[in-house]
């Protein structure tokens, strides 16, 4: 299946984009607020990522209008995003302070801190685990859509989504299974296997509800409370099944079962994500990108992780390979923005009403956590967009082995994202970390300068 066929199968070719009128009925007021996390690995090659249009030092704050930049002002890695300049917010100088403060392998920490802002703890050997939820699951806890959240993985990658106990949320890595889950009724009214399963699910859940009602009078108060908790879970599942059976949206065609290139698989999942958002099936999605191959990048022999990512700070060949690596993901991110920005909605586009966050588990392939490469797009309902915002490194965070000066803790960005989605929170993850002078860095509250 070629690229054009994939686009057609997903309903994303020219003239066949999802339109809001084809989605679930919304209130006559403002459109839904949505958020998508696009998470990749191995940090970045900072000198080939950062923007310094005026030749500014890394030691000063910067606030620049991205639409004023020339093509030459864009860095090699971020150049594919130039066409979306007016809707981007490039954040430079944020840090995973939880990972800086933790006392084990920096690589195994980043994925656990990325969306939680938490202090990761080593489990299963050395792999990090947070003690609380990621921001997407904080938002999902109050979601009323058929799916509270969706988590997709392309080429794998460590989990970045966690429940309120710090347990990893599993990814869906099969686009066909993802489609069947979104559209159990199939397309064109066909009586598909998925639709038959959905009907059976409804019957089973109805029988379970009857069983609960019959048992409840026979139980003690303590057991009845436990049973009612299970009944509520079943009721939630029943509502989800019913909602999916009654989706008032033309489902996209089922995708094929093979993808010649990772870019095709990524585009397939992006199409599913846009369809889910457009149809009102969820407002919260994570797309996790895993490790790319040498062949895809045209890289010389060697291990992407150990030979190139680790050496990109001081080896020109490794830096070139990893620049290509992160540029590839920038191109995929730009394509996701193209899809969202191509759908008219409420006097703007779907991108205007969606916050899309490209973030990473690390800041560099050598396992640093300062100067995190974070790019946001859309979200003009909450943020003053079209800007490069640099936070100078003014806070020396005390780690177990060294001191790292940071601009702002990324916990504050997580708070800002939650607030933008309509939640009232004062902190996400850690509330403070130690500074080298014995005082503490406050990690609570929203990130300044976003509005």
Language-model regions: role of each:
Residues 1-451:
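Ligand-binding pockets and gating/stacking loops
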């Amino acid at each position: 299946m070629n690229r054009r066929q994939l686009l057609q199968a997903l309903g994303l070719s020219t003239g066949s984009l999802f339109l809001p009128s084809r989605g679930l009925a919304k209130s006559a007021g403002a459109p839904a607020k949505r958020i998508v996390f696009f998470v990749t690995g191995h940090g970045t090659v900072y000198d080939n990522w950062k923007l310094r249009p005026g030749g500014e030092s890394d030691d000063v704050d910067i606030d620049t209008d991205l639409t004023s930049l020339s093509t030459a002002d864009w860095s090699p890695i971020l150049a594919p995003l130039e066409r979306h300049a007016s809707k981007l917010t490039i954040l430079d100088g944020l840090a995973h302070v939880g990972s800086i403060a933790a006392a084990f392998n920096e690589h195994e920490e980043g994925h656990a801190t990325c969306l939680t802002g938490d202090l990761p703890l080593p489990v299963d050997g050395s792999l990090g685990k947070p003690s609380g939820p990621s921001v997407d699951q904080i938002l999902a806890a109050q979601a009323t859509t058929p799916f509270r959240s969706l988590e997709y993985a392309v080429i794998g990658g460590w989990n970045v989504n966690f429940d309120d106990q710090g347990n990893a949320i599993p990814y869906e890595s099969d686009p066909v299974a993802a489609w069947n889950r979104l559209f159990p009724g199939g397309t064109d009214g066909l009586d598909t296997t998925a639709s038959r399963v959905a009907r059976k699910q409804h019957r089973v859940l109805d029988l379970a509800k009857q069983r609960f009602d019959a048992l409840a009078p026979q139980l003690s108060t303590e057991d009845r409370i436990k049973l009612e908790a299970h009944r509520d879970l079943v009721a939630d599942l029943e509502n989800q099944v019913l909602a999916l059976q009654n989706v008032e949206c033309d489902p996209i065609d089922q995708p094929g079962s093979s993808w010649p290139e990772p870019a095709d698989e990524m585009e397939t999942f992006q199409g599913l994500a846009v369809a889910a958002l457009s149809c009102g099936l969820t407002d919260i999605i994570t797309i996790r990108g895993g490790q790319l191959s040498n062949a895809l990048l045209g890289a010389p022999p060697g291990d992407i992780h150990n030979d190139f990512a680790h050496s990109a700070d001081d080896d020109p060949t490794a830096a070139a390979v990893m620049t290509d690596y992160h540029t590839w993901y920038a191109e995929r991110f730009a394509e996701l923005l193209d899809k969202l920005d191509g759908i008219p909605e409420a006097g703007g586009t779907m991108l205007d009403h969606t916050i899309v966050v490209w973030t990473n588990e690390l800041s560099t392939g050598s396992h640093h956590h300062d100067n995190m490469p974070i790019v946001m797009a859309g979200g003009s309902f909450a943020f003053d967009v079209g800007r490069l915002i640099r936070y100078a490194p003014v806070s020396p965070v005390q780690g177990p082995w060294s001191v790292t000066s940071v601009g702002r803790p990324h916990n504050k960005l997580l708070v800002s994202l939650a607030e933008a989605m309509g939640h009232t929170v004062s902190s996400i993850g850690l509330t403070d970390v130690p500074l080298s002078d014995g005082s503490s860095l406050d990690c609570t509250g929203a990130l300044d300068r976003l509005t």
